[in-house]
A protein has these predicted regions:
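Glycine-rich phosphate-binding loop of ATP-dependent small-molecule kinases
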Residues: 1-187
Length: 187
């Protein structure tokens, strides 16, 4: 299974992604985790990333792409993977397709979109901000994050939809109900 996990901030994709890891026994790969692992392992790309981060700069896209490709090429990802947080836009999806082709994979198997209404996301994130004492997560900031996500992700949903790879799951309900919906559509 080669799965791209899509969902707005607060949609529950992180939680459901962990449940999928346990259920299917394949790794969940996030760009942040892959970046930290490459830096820790002191790979050539990891050293480039570390230099940028130490200077307070953004890590160049090409370095991020290389690190993701390195991670996808590791033995534990050969039988499948769950990508969380990548791709974020159409250009990254096209880069991902090239990576998978170079690695001998047949591309993304499914793109799972965990759909939650904007109002529910606002409610969840405000609740989380209050519980975690995150004063910077105000409603206007949250709505802006949702708008940015929607603008970036809409073409991505179309891209995977046209390929017949997009599956949408309603992300409201108990954790177990949502997970069962996900497992059902991935069968």
């Amino acid at each position: 299974m080669r799965l791209v996990l899509l969902g707005a901030p607060g949609s529950g994709k992180g939680t459901q992604g962990e449940k999928l890891v346990a259920h299917f026994g394949i790794p969940k790969i996030s760009t942040g985790d892959a970046l930290r692992a490459a830096v820790k392992a002191r790979t050539p790309l990891g050293l480039h990333a570390k230099a940028a981060m130490d200077a307070g700069d953004l890590v160049a896209n090409e370095v991020v792409y290389g690190i993701v490709e390195e991670r996808l090429g590791q033995p534990d990802a050969q039988k499948g993977f769950i990508l969380d947080g990548f791709p974020r836009n159409l250009a990254q999806a096209q880069v991902l397709d090239g990576m998978l082709e170079r690695l001998g994979a047949k591309g993304v198997g499914k793109a799972l979109h965990l759909h939650v209404s904007d109002e529910e996301i606002v409610r969840r994130l405000l609740d989380r901000a209050q519980k975690e004492g995150r004063a910077d997560d105000t409603e206007p900031v949250i709505r802006h994050r949702i708008d940015v996500y929607n603008a970036e992700t809409s073409p991505l949903l179309d891209y995977y939809g046209k390929q017949g790879k997009l599956v949408k799951v309603e992300g409201v309900g108990s954790l177990d109900e949502i997970f069962q919906r996900i497992v059902d559509v991935l069968k």
